């Protein structure tokens, strides 16, 4: 590394590690992954591994190689930059059921947001995901009531001024977008990277105390998919590949570079910041960034 680049990297690291000021009020504890769609196909490497075409259609973000045969090894083998996420060392795979208007898949061309937040009260205790952790969030077989009352539910489907729709609204103002946000469980059992139902190794924090249960003691980042679809007007023919709006769910297969993910979790979640994909909080610029201008750890 050239001396000038080395000094710049060192300066970024020093700024990144600066402690919070005493009056630094904490309002958020998060960072985000900004990723565009890679492709859509009827594969699900978690639920139907090595069975191409066995699933309903999914829309994929992140790692460009994801298919039915995907493993941790294949995600990592894709190599740095084989992702549509801004951080080139995030080789994770993210996917959800494809949205259709009639028989036409609705695929956005803009960046979608996956938030990494604290789901527990003591945000300083959140730990990075172990590499290879994978899970399914939500339930495609849920009833409308179950979807509405699920621990991951926030505001249902939204478009324009219409919120808290637990199925697709019948009409969205022309030019608006259909949006959905849904939160993942953020307590890990500390042992299993997957489970038979792809859910039991994860749990939601207690709703009152916001602490992890004893059988899932490890607090990890709470994912929150915030997905926007370019569809509006008459919504009567809008559906998910999995069914009605309340069948919404998504999958995550972690393949972050461990050091990069740890830097973002430590700086942004544990540090009580509202960070972008670079680990920079524009409201507290004195705290620096977790990653360099290229969205990588300095020196990588």
Where are the predicted features?
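Bacterial N-terminal signal peptides that target proteins for export
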Residues: 1-7
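Bacterial N-terminal signal peptides
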Residues: 8-16
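Sec/Tat signal peptide C-region and signal peptidase I cleavage site
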Residues: 18-22
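Primary mode marks residue(s) on the alpha4-beta5-alpha5 output face of response regulator receiver
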Residues: 23-55, 59-182, 189-300
């Amino acid at each position: 590394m050239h001396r000038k680049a080395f000094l710049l990297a060192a300066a970024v690291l020093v700024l990144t590690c600066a402690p919070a000021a005493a009056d630094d009020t904490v309002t958020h504890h998060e960072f985000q992954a900004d990723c565009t769609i890679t492709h859509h196909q009827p594969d699900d490497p978690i639920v139907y591994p090595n069975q191409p075409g066995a699933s309903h259609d999914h829309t994929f973000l992140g790692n460009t190689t994801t298919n039915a045969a995907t493993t941790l090894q294949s995600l990592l083998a894709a190599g740095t930059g084989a992702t549509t996420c801004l951080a080139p060392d995030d080789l994770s795979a993210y996917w959800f059921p494809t949205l259709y208007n009639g028989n036409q898949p609705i695929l956005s061309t803009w960046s979608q947001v996956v938030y990494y937040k604290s789901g527990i009260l003591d945000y300083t205790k959140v730990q990075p995901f172990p590499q290879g952790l994978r899970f399914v969030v939500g339930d495609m077989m849920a009833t409308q009531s179950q979807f509405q009352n699920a621990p991951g539910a926030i505001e249902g489907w939204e478009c324009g001024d219409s919120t808290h729709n637990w199925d697709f609204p019948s009409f969205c103002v022309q030019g608006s977008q259909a949006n959905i946000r849904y939160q993942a469980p953020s307590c890990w059992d500390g042992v299993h990277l997957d489970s038979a139902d792809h859910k039991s190794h994860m749990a939601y924090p207690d709703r009152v105390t916001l602490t992890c249960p004893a059988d899932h003691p490890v607090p990890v980042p709470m994912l929150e998919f915030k997905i926007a679809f370019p569809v509006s007007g008459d919504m009567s023919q809008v559906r998910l590949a999995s069914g009605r709006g309340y069948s919404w769910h998504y999958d995550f297969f972690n393949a972050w570079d461990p050091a990069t993910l740890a830097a973002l979790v430590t700086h942004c979640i544990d540090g009580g910041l509202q960070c972008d994909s670079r680990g920079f909080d524009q409201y507290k610029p004195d705290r620096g960034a977790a990653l360099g201008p290229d969205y990588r750890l300095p020196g990588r």
